[in-house]
Amino acid sequence: AGASRIVIGSLAVREPETVREMFAEFGREKICLAADVMWGEPEDDEAGYYIAVSGWQEASAMKLSQFLEIFGEVGLRHVLCTDISRDGTMTGCNTALYEEVKTSFPAIQLQASGGVSSLGDLEALSTHGVIIGKALYEGAFGLGEALAIGRRKAGTC
């Protein structure tokens, strides 16, 4: 009984060494890192996806790729990646973002979040999981339909 995996968000950016120690103590299968991202073009750095912290209230100086590299060194396996700009909008998934993550970090089992609007979005994703909150709530499709796609695609990610 109990939780088999925990999700860690802002702590991974604010106290990366603490989270690295958690990986050492509990192992890679017990931890999922939340990578809530927003596009940024800071004056001093290059444009890209940056990790947001504090419930999406502030952008950190850490790029998504840097975040994944740092924790990849300790065996990062599970990531929940939310494109904040699309969360709750039902405007479609940022498949380009998720494909870039999967291509650059193939060992990661990625869960996508933000923008799901249709069954077509589920078909287009090649992630290991997806958050379908608002689309399901608004009745864009049924849970059975979404699960059928998941069952059919199982093992293809």
Predicted regions and their residues:
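C-terminal helical cap(s) of enzyme catalytic domains, especially alpha/beta-barrels
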Residues: V19-F26, E123-C157
